[in-house]
Amino acid sequence: SDLIDVPFDDIVKINIYLKNLSDIEAVNQAYTTFFPDSAIARTVAYVPARTAVEVAGLPMNALVQIEAVVSHGDGTPPQAVEDRHGIVIKPNNTDKAPKCALSTQTVAFSHYNNISAQLPIDPKTGKLVAGGVKEQAAQCLSHIKAIVESIGHKMDDVVKVNVFVKN
């Protein structure tokens, strides 16, 4: 098989699937040994957009499974190898949504923006919003709207949304 040679800085989105969400702190300890990767990434505190989800089970009874979206690689179509350095990866955070030291709210590359999963947190208090699933969903979507608008887009530009619910 052919391998692509890309640095971790080219990762724009990470999805973490955990058998037990209580293991997230241990995952974070490992995660911070990989991100940020390069001196440049550390200087600007670049980390990919990120989602963590608890799942009922994983292949081979694993405790964690991680997937990544990479912005480009040597010769990845439609870019030629020599065009690789012309691709821009642009991270952005807004104060209108909760921030996390381990992820960026949105990471743009090509004509896509990858947005980190949003929890129903009041960005001013850092606490879950009052109410049920309707109020919590509205808060999550308000964060997504604020993030989308902070990069000059509107909700009509969103092409995919993943929703994770307890019941």
For the regions a language model picked out, list residue spans one by one.
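N-terminal presequence-like segments and the immediate start of the first folded domain
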Residues: 2-12, 18-160, 164-167
